[in-house]
């Protein structure tokens, strides 16, 4: 009985965990924040850089709060924050820490874009930039995404020689395989036709031999019609 009871308790715990996961999963999937595919971006000192950020919500949003924050090993601060009333209005900035920052995004037409433009870059701007979003309509559910900005003196040219060599080799191998397959099919087709011709020749030769030897079914066996 003890084993059966333990088995029942284990199944109940697993069932409870599964139900809890199914309950929490929509919450984690409903509000998403993205800063693009690249986790690190590079920009030249003195130039401008667009820090991308978009959000999405399955349940819509009202009075959505957003902010951009900056931090490195020495300091941390909020760069800009604001409110988006709904999907028909643009973001309204409340606080802006630096005049070099401009909100470039728009939330109209379901773009949900709260990207910022950082101008006149300095080497001290190197660090992590986090885009944070909180949606009161989803019981203040929040999410964030971080991108690392590296300010450099000049951008290094990427040497694609190795990549081009690899692509050329792979392309050559694929081309060779295709040629081999086509040649194999051609040889198979020629051999098949050759066998068919040989077979026809043998059948024809066999029929001629039967005719010459007067075998049954040959023309030599035929008799002229009897005259009455």
Curated annotation (Swiss-Prot):
It is a single-pass type I membrane protein. Contains an interchain disulfide bond with SCN2A. Residues 31-161 are extracellular. InterPro entries: Ig-like_dom, Ig-like_dom_sf, Ig-like_fold, Ig_sub, Ig_V-set, Myelin_P0-rel. Residues 203-213 have a biased composition (Polar residues). Residues 1-30 form the signal peptide. This is Sodium channel regulatory subunit beta-4. The lineage of its organism: Eukaryota, Metazoa, Chordata, Craniata, Vertebrata. The gene is Scn4b.
């Amino acid at each position: 009985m003890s084993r059966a009871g333990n088995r029942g308790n284990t199944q109940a715990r697993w069932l409870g965990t599964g139900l809890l996961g199914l309950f929490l999963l929509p919450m984690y999937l409903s509000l998403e924040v993205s800063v693009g595919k690249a986790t690190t971006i590079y920009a030249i000192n003195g130039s401008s850089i667009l820090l991308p950020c978009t959000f999405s919500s399955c349940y819509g949003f009202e009075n959505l709060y957003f902010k951009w924050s900056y931090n490195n090993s020495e300091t941390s601060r909020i760069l800009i924050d604001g409110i988006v009333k709904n999907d028909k209005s643009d973001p309204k900035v409340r606080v802006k820490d630096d005049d070099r920052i401009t909100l470039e995004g728009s939330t109209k037409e379901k773009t949900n874009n709260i990207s910022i433009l950082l101008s006149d870059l300095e080497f001290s701007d190197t660090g992590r930039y986090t885009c944070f979003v909180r949606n009161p309509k989803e019981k203040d559910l929040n999410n964030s995404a971080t991108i690392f900005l590296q300010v450099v003196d000049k951008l290094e040219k990427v040497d694609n020689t190795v990549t081009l060599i690899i692509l050329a080799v792979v392309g050559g191998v694929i081309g060779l395989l295709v040629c081999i397959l086509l040649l194999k099919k051609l040889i198979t087709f020629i051999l098949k036709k050759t066998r068919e011709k040989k077979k026809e020749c043998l059948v024809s030769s066999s029929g001629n031999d039967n005719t010459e030897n007067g075998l049954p079914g040959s023309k030599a066996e035929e008799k002229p019609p009897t005259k009455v």
